UniProtKB/Swiss-Prot annotation:
GO cellular component, one term: plasma membrane
Record field: compositional bias (Polar residues): 112-126
Compartment(s) of residence: Cell membrane
Entry keyword set: Cell membrane, Coiled coil, Lipoprotein, Membrane, Palmitate, Signal
Organism: Rickettsia prowazekii (strain Madrid E)
Region (Disordered): 110-136
Protein name per its UniProtKB record: Uncharacterized lipoprotein RP413
Amino acid sequence: MFKKIIILFLGIFLLSSCTDNFRNYFQRSANNKLLDIKGAKGGKRKPVYNNKYIDLAKKNILEDNIDDDDNDSDANYDSDSLLIGEKIDNIKKNREMYINMIKRDIARQKAESNATQSNNDMTLSKANKKVRKDDSYKEKKIEEELNQIKAMLRETKRDITKYTCPNATVNQNYVPPVTNYENENYPPIKNSRPYNNTSKVKQKFIREDDDNTSNACSI
């Protein structure tokens, strides 16, 4: 009877080695036990890991002591643009990209600050341009004032010509006569005889008066 039990047990063991399902039951659990009832949860067993490696991994994660795995097989893949087996470190590439962007921004800011500083500095050529600009502005203002004065003089001259005789001539050697007689207001002469407006003598005096008034503006 005992022999039959041993033969049956060995037969079951040999048959279970031919299938994967039965093989899983004889693997060690996470607690390093061949038969572990507590290790199975939800019909699945925990992977076989050593507890000291799990504790070491937790410690490294808390201390941020994570090294890149250069021997990772997932980092190597086939691509048309890359050779087979070429390693790509995305973290390193991103870090270099951001460093280059920061360097470009710093260089651009330095160039802009130098440009603004050079524009604010006074040089000999800038001083000459400024002086020429100021001189041209002053000359323009003076020319405008002269044109205004000339226009005023022309207008004054036109106003003067309105009150002068057109045929008047100026005698520079004219000296007014000196008389010792004082101006006296004599009373008008009373004459009862009427004036003869048709007399030749009176017409002659009228013509002489007209000639004198026409030449009155000539000195």
